[in-house]
C-alpha cells in the first residue's frame, strides 16, 4: 500500500511507533487490520450521521472486508465513505483513512491467505460489536439512557476487544510458530481474549461520564457494581501481563506488556473512576510515566519467558 506507513502515522502516532517493535512478519497484517478497524470505528462514532446510515455502512464494510460484496457493492462502499462520511471527520487522519479505505482493503487482499483469513474474522467480530452498540443505544439522547445487562457488556467487550487479543495470538503463533510462547495456544488464546476485554473495560470505566452525555451507559454507577467491574478489569489486565510473560520473542513481549501496564496506571489516576463530568478534560497517563513504563518494558522483554503469572 503506497503511503501506508504515513497514513497509519496520521491516524495514530502511538500505534505507528509500537508497530516498529513487532516481529517483521506481523507488521503489515497488524497495520492493515488496525486501519480497517479504525475506519469502522470512525463510521460507528460519526455522530453527524444517523444510526441508520452508520449501521448500513458498517454492514456494507463488513461485506467488503469478508469478501462477500460484489464489485458494485465495493465501489458503492468506497464512494459513500469518501463522499458522505469523510468530510465530517474532525480528525484529519480519519478523514483521509475513509477516503483511502479501498486501498486498505486492497492491501489486505495482497497479504498471504492465512493472514487474510485472520483479519476477516477479527474485523467481522468487531463490526458485530459496533452494530450491537448502535442498535442498543441508537443515536443516543441524554435523558433516555439504557444500561445493558452484564452478559451484554461481556459479549460487547469480547467483540470489540477480546477478539483482538485472539487475533494477535493467532497471527503471532502463525508467524513465530514454536518460538511464540511457552504456554499452549489454547492458554494464550484465553489470556489474550481476557487481556483485550480488560483494556476495553478500562475505557468503559474511564469514559462513563462522557458516554452518559451521549446517551450511553454500559455499566451501572452503583458502588458495588462498579467495584466488581473494576476488580474484573484489574484481573484481566493481570492476565495481560501473564500473557506477555509467556511470550518468547523479545520484541513481542515489549509491545504486548505496555498496554497492560498503561491500563493499570490509568485505573490508578486520581478520580478516574469517580464519574467526573464529561466537560472535564479526559485524564491520561503522563509522558514521564509512559517513559518509565517503556524502560520497564524493555527490561521485562529481556527476562526469560514464564509459564504462569
What is the meaning of each model-derived region?
Residues 1-199, 205-309:
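Catalytic cores of Mg2+-dependent Asp-rich isoprenoid enzymes
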Amino acid at each position: 500500500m503506497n503511503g501506508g506507513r504515513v497514513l497509519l502515522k496520521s491516524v495514530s502516532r502511538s500505534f505507528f511507533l509500537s508497530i516498529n517493535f513487532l516481529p517483521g512478519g506481523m507488521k503489515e497484517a497488524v497495520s492493515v487490520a488496525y486501519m480497517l478497524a479504525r475506519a469502522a470505528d470512525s463510521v460507528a462514532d460519526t455522530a453527524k450521521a444517523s444510526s441508520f446510515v452508520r449501521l448500513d455502512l458498517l454492514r456494507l464494510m463488513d461485506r467488503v472486508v469478508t469478501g462477500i460484496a460484489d464489485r458494485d457493492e465495493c465501489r458503492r462502499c468506497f464512494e459513500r465513505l469518501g463522499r458522505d462520511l469523510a468530510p465530517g471527520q474532525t480528525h484529519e487522519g480519519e478523514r483521509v483513512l475513509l477516503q483511502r479505505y479501498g486501498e486498505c482493503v486492497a492491501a489486505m487482499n495482497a497479504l498471504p491467505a492465512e493472514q487474510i483469513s485472520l483479519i476477516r474474522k477479527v474485523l467481522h467480530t468487531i463490526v458485530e460489536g459496533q452494530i450491537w452498540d448502535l442498535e442498543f443505544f441508537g443515536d443516543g439522547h441524554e435523558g433516555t439512557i439504557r444500561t445493558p445487562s452484564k452478559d451484554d457488556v461481556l459479549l460487547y467487550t469480547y467483540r470489540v476487544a477480546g477478539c483482538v487479543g485472539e487475533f494477535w495470538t493467532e497471527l503471532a503463533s502463525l508467524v513465530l510458530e514454536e518460538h511464540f510462547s511457552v504456554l499452549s495456544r489454547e492458554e494464550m488464546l484465553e489470556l489474550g481474549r481476557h487481556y483485550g476485554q480488560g483494556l476495553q473495560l478500562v475505557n468503559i470505566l474511564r469514559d462513563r461520564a462522557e458516554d452518559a452525555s451521549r446517551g450511553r451507559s454500559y455499566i451501572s454507577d452503583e458502588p458495588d457494581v462498579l467495584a466488581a467491574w473494576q476488580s474484573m478489569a484489574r484481573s484481566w489486565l493481570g492476565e495481560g501481563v501473564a500473557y506477555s510473560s509467556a511470550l518468547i520473542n523479545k520484541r513481542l513481549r515489549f509491545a504486548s506488556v505496555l498496554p497492560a501496564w498503561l491500563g493499570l496506571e490509568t485505573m490508578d489516576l486520581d478520580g478516574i473512576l469517580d464519574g467526573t463530568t464529561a466537560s472535564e478534560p479526559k485524564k491520561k497517563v503522563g509522558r514521564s510515566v509512559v517513559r518509565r513504563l517503556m524502560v520497564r518494558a524493555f527490561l521485562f522483554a529481556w527476562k526469560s519467558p514464564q509459564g504462569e503469572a
